[in-house]
Amino acid sequence: MALHVLEALQHGVSVEAVLSDPKVAPALGERRRRQAEMDTVISDSTEVIDRLAIARLEGRGLRSNGYHVTAQVGDDCDACLVVHGDVGASFGEQDRYPVSASFYTNSFLHTAGGLYDLTRLATRFDPDGGGHANACGCRIQALETGTRVDRVVTEGDIEANLAAWLEMWAER
């Protein structure tokens, strides 16, 4: 599809003609439908706490990036945290992946960089977590009394990870 669109544009076909092309229009309609569905899911699954938007997408088989979340929440958040994946899953399982968290600065609001180094959150419990200060991630970790333990992650662990991250965020 992308090659078809690119070749049409290279041959001088107008954008309007490309968008109404019988090969493109149905795919574009489907993409718009999926986008509207994701907008609804994000809206229904997101809570803003202390200017941190928390989107709970775990167990839904859906993934979204934080830019989508921060675009929807707008100026009410300085950053977002997206929880996604499947509780109890591990790497290598077909159609399932470990429950994880992604962190993003609201770059629509903070164009020169965020107010907080989000890698601090991503590396708090996960030694493999990290990324960029304004966009990073980690796996949710199994915790007992705030310490990482070697066992399958539960729903309670998601809550424990979130609670610790919210404490850290509050100290920014």
Where are these regions (language model features)?
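Glycine-rich, Lys/Arg-enriched anion-binding loops that position phosphate/diphosphate groups
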Residues: 1-76
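Glycine-rich, acidic loop segments that terminate in or are immediately followed by a histidine
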Residues: 53-172
